[in-house]
């Protein structure tokens, strides 16, 4: 199986993404010689990885945009029959130490969300994984209001992390952006700032976009 050459420009990326619209995951997987899992319980990232592969994304799990040379992040988004997002969208790992002087403009969240190619995919559990179809892609850049909301949430969350209050942050914090434990294994630990300024061990955290925010983005395009 030959790796797909990354798209040379934005129009080539969008052309590839648009060509997938209406196609089932089984068709894409067969074309790439990949076995479709029975369900996604143990393969939660399978859909995203398949779409990344088909579009020629280069970043993998590196902390940079999927199409760094185009300044584009790729996000697959599972939707229901009404086009509503079924789950929050993972953005990146949250830094829990060495954050003094870190600004929104320099943050990985800001960098990743400057320009996103959203690829909706049918995600309702009653549809077999292989039968789920890819939807029409959306190239999105946050407008001033969306940037403001994201920045505001990020700054409030980072302030609480800096004050050693990471354990007090719940998924309810933030209007559009939330912080949640990242590891599937709750025994995974990393360092974070304690309230007295020392370091303590805690579960890794990740930034996620709330479904109300992604629903609003999809609604702006599809109504």
Curated annotation (Swiss-Prot):
Pfam families: MutH (PF02976). The keyword Ribosomal protein does not apply. GO terms for molecular function: DNA binding; endonuclease activity. Keywords: Cytoplasm, DNA damage, DNA repair, Endonuclease, Hydrolase, Nuclease. GO terms for biological process: DNA modification; mismatch repair. The keyword rRNA-binding does not apply. It comes from the Bacteria. GO terms for cellular component: cytoplasm. Its main location: cytoplasm. SMART domains: MutH. It is found in: Cytoplasm. NCBIfam families: mutH_TIGR (TIGR02248), PRK05070.1 (NF003458). Belongs to the MutH family. Sequence-specific endonuclease that cleaves unmethylated GATC sequences. It is involved in DNA mismatch repair. HAMAP family: MutH. This is DNA mismatch repair protein MutH.
């Amino acid at each position: 199986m030959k790796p797909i050459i990354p798209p040379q420009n934005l129009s080539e990326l969008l052309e590839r993404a648009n060509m997938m619209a209406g196609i089932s995951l089984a068709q894409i997987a067969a074309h790439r010689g990949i076995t479709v899992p029975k369900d996604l319980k143990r393969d939660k990232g399978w859909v995203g990885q398949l779409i990344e592969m088909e579009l020629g994304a280069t970043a993998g799990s590196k902390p940079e945009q999927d199409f760094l040379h185009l300044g584009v992040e790729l996000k697959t988004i599972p939707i229901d029959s009404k086009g509503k997002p079924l789950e929050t969208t993972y953005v990146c790992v949250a830094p829990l130490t060495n954050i003094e002087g870190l600004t929104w403009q320099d943050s990985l969240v800001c960098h990743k969300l400057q320009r996103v190619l959203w690829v909706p995919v049918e995600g309702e559990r009653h549809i077999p994984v292989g039968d789920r179809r890819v939807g029409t892609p959306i190239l999105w850049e946050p407008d001033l209001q969306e940037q403001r909301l994201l920045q505001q949430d990020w700054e409030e969350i980072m302030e609480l992390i800096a004050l050693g209050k990471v354990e007090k942050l719940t998924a309810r914090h933030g209007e559009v952006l939330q912080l949640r434990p990242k590891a599937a294994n709750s025994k995974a630990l990393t360092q974070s700032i304690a309230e007295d300024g020392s370091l303590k061990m805690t579960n890794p955290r990740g930034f996620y976009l709330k479904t109300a925010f992604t629903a609003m983005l999809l609604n702006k395009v599809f109504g």
